[in-house]
Amino acid sequence: MHSTDTIVAQATPPGRGGVGILRVSGPKAAVVAQTILGKVPKPRYADYLPFRNEDNSVLDQGIALFFPNPNSFTGEDVLELQGHGGPIILDLLLKRILQIPGIRIAKPGEFSERAFLNDKLDLAQAEAIADLIDASSEQAARSAINSLQGAFSSHINEMVESLTNLRIYVEAAIDFPDEEIDFLSDGVIEGKLNTVISQLDDVRTQARQGSLLREGMKVVIAGRPNAGKSSLLNALAGREAAIVTDIAGTTRDVLREHIHIDGMPLHIIDTAGLREASDEVERIGIERAWQEIEQADRVLFMVDSTTTEATTPEEIWPEFMARLPSTLPVTVIRNKSDLTGEPAEITSQGDYPMIRLSARDGMGIELLRSHLKEAMGFNSNTEGGFLARRRHLQALNTAAEHLQQGYQQLVYAKSGELLAEELRLAQQALSEITGEFTSDDLLGRIFSSFCIGK
């Protein structure tokens, strides 16, 4: 057990509802039960009881559940009081519980943090709880459930076990240098190392899919005024999210829409038309547009095809391309093909994909949807997949770098000591995902992002 105090919080969302739940965890959970209920319910059995105030008057009535340690979510004694979901009733009951000495309000994510600290789940599973609550699509929810049930962690634990065994073999090579068999050159270590590298590559691929499901893709629509940017936003969103007129400069601020393409979250951002600003309001809008462009995963460069026959971005607008970050992916959208008679199609112009479409009548929109999925490497078949966060990707990439460095030390430098160190660092990076090696500061940041009752 890592804590001696007892915490309480509302486990259901704020507001009115049919049921409201208060959760208590810690060594005084049984004291709370005795005080509020007049008894400690039989473990893991639902008991319908009155919830009593200090003067023995009834505050509410409902179901009480008691889970003695270690067989509870947090690994501590846990009491759940399930009453009516009125905010006044729940607040009165919460105040009554807080009158009991040694009880305090839980910090955000503290229940999950205690479950982690008491080895009821690892850090990746704890994060999956928050991801399940925040899931924005059915696929994201399924993947979060998989993570909660240990799908991600099992991959990590398997690789950590493989690295442990490999380190033992390498240490043997270091400790017995005079053996007839040259451990570093017999091919066994290289074969084992390649197996772990291959395992890690597979997990990184799955993790990138999981990150897409969780984080989504930020796409910024940019171009000159009246190119059809807002019409494209509306076409992708499937509703009139932006005002569309023939007047150039109608959009003066950033507009955001959140949609899904076969389960992939897509954050679409419509920006003000880029030109020399005619007033201060438009200038601010254009500056905000550039801020969004520079933070995008991909830019849809909108071109009014009735105004130019040029197809490469540098020909169409050299000043725009000169300001773009060189690593930022760009897709050219030649809009208004309904007016030019151009067929809806996707081609490439140099390094840039180009899509001819009509945002107004929807022609070519499905081509764009498919292109965005393909550009991000998204696979809608995520059976057995898991969600991943940016910190997970960073840890996996760090581990991959150390394994590649280790391979160089093995094959070219023939250095067992340096190989052993790279294997240790790779193992440490992987263990940060499940929380085996994680700083208290990182734990605080992770769990503080949870809701209060989790």
Swiss-Prot record:
Homodimer. Heterotetramer of two MnmE and two MnmG subunits. This is tRNA modification GTPase MnmE. Keywords: Cytoplasm, GTP-binding, Hydrolase, Magnesium, Metal-binding, Nucleotide-binding, Potassium, tRNA processing. One of its GO terms (biological process) is tRNA wobble uridine modification. It is found in: Cytoplasm. Its cofactor is K(+). Its EC number is 3.6.-.-. Its main location: cytoplasm. Exhibits a very high intrinsic GTPase hydrolysis rate. Involved in the addition of a carboxymethylaminomethyl (cmnm) group at the wobble position (U34) of certain tRNAs, forming tRNA-cmnm(5)s(2)U34. InterPro entries: G_TrmE, GTP-bd, GTP-bd_TrmE_N, GTPase_MnmE, MnmE_dom2, MnmE_helical, P-loop_NTPase, Small_GTP-bd. PANTHER family: TRNA MODIFICATION GTPASE GTPBP3, TRNA MODIFICATION GTPASE GTPBP3, MITOCHONDRIAL. GTP binds at residues 226-231, 245-251, 270-273, 358-360. (6S)-5-formyl-5,6,7,8-tetrahydrofolate binds at R23, E80, K120, K454. Binds 1 potassium ion per subunit. Transmembrane segments: none annotated. Residues 216-377 form the TrmE-type G domain. It comes from the Bacteria. Belongs to the TRAFAC class TrmE-Era-EngA-EngB-Septin-like GTPase superfamily. TrmE GTPase family. GO terms for molecular function: GTP binding; GTPase activity; metal ion binding.
